Amino acid sequence: MAGLGANSDVMVKLDDGHLNNSLRSPVQAGVYFRGHIKGGMRPGKKVLVMGIVDHNPKSFAISLTCGDSEDPPADVAIELKVVFTNQQVFRNSCISGESDEENLAFPYFPFVPDQPFRMEIFCQQPCFRVLVDGHHLFDFYHRIQTLSAIDSIKISGDLQITKLG
């Protein structure tokens, strides 16, 4: 099954344009998702992504960004890239077009083909705390200090999105 593709022309938006509703049915393969985080991030706020990994995945990515501009590209507060070929999770940010060095960031690899997952990204004062299926995966210290500017989410790759919150 093909995955959510970054080059896809199909856009999926929630009814009210905000990331505070469940999707009525899974977002099918071949879709690139962009959504708005109502009010932006702040300490104590959580972003929930539930999905099912495709049958034969290569990778998927989840990014929290400052807007959804493509030109110039929006600042990326945190990008999580899950790569199945070598079972790695990378984390990164990109501010004013300058990417940090990608950090390999996991004590274990929690993603399994054809299986559901629940990822929670908690915004805390010094960092994002990322949990998968209730287990701590890593902390990522903020590179963007104005947390409320982090108001968009992008998801692409080899997965189906079943719920956002």
UniProtKB/Swiss-Prot annotation:
It comes from Mus musculus. The gene is Lgalsl2. This is Galectin-like protein 2. PROSITE patterns: GALECTIN. It comes from the Eukaryota. It holds the Pfam family Gal-bind_lectin. The lineage of its organism: Eukaryota, Metazoa, Chordata, Craniata, Vertebrata. InterPro entries: ConA-like_dom_sf, Galectin-like, Galectin_CRD. Does not bind lactose, and may not bind carbohydrates. GO terms for molecular function: carbohydrate binding. Monomer. The keyword Phosphoprotein does not apply. Residues 32-161 form the Galectin domain. Keywords: Lectin. Disulfide bonds: none annotated.
